[in-house]
UniProtKB/Swiss-Prot annotation:
Plays a role in cell envelope biogenesis, maintenance of cell envelope integrity and membrane homeostasis. It is found in: Cell membrane. InterPro entries: YciB. It comes from Buchnera aphidicola subsp. Baizongia pistaciae (strain Bp). The gene is yciB. Keywords: Cell membrane, Membrane, Transmembrane, Transmembrane helix. This is Membrane-spanning protein YciB.
């Protein structure tokens, strides 16, 4: 259910972009993100830090987009977020003993520290690739192509990364059982 609620801002952005323009779409993204944040906080009786950080980025970059009437801000938001996530996973991989992924999934998946480290490196590289890809699309393609890439391309890339992780974990778990 949370996944569906969190999809509302993206769907809203896409629909308003198709019928209006990036500025109306950015405003709808801001409103839908705030609405979704409030609803999920009430339904799940807690404030998710990830959702709060995302909301702050959406509001700040959405406001800048509207205030300066410049779509670059909303486009670069994606690159900045993915780059920061990549850095967090890289720092976690290199310097921190308590692996971030292990902390997140500690009640769900039991893996060795070495495997958690490899997964952190994988996600660091993945988010860096997404940041670089978004930058490339911003610089060399039309706004419409960027919107399509943001909505569908990055979603598909993320789904592929999750599937790869799932197969990797399944392979490791089945190897341990045998």
């Amino acid at each position: 259910m949370k996944f569906l609620l969190n999809s509302i801002p993206t769907i809203s952005f896409f629909i308003f972009y198709k019928f209006y323009d990036i500025f109306i779409a950015s405003f709808s993204l801001m409103i839908a993100s705030l609405f979704t944040f409030i609803i999920t906080s009430i339904l799940f009786n807690s404030i998710n830090k990830h959702d709060l950080i995302n909301l702050i980025f959406v509001i700040v970059f959405g406001f800048l987009t509207l205030f300066y009437h410049n779509s670059s801000y909303i486009k670069w938001k994606v690159t900045i977020i993915y780059f920061l996530i990549s850095i967090v996973f890289l720092i976690n991989y290199l310097f921190i003993k308590n692996n971030l992924l292990n902390i997140i999934f500690k009640n769900t998946i039991q893996l060795s520290k070495n495997v958690w480290r490899k997964l952190s490196l994988f996600w660091s590289i993945f988010f860096l690739i997404c940041a670089v890809s978004n930058t490339y699309i911003i610089l060399y393609f039309s706004e419409q192509t960027w919107v399509t890439f943001k909505i569908f391309g990055l979603t598909i890339l993320t789904l592929i990364a999750v599937i790869i992780n799932g197969f990797y974990i399944y392979f490791l778990k089945s190897k341990i059982i045998q």
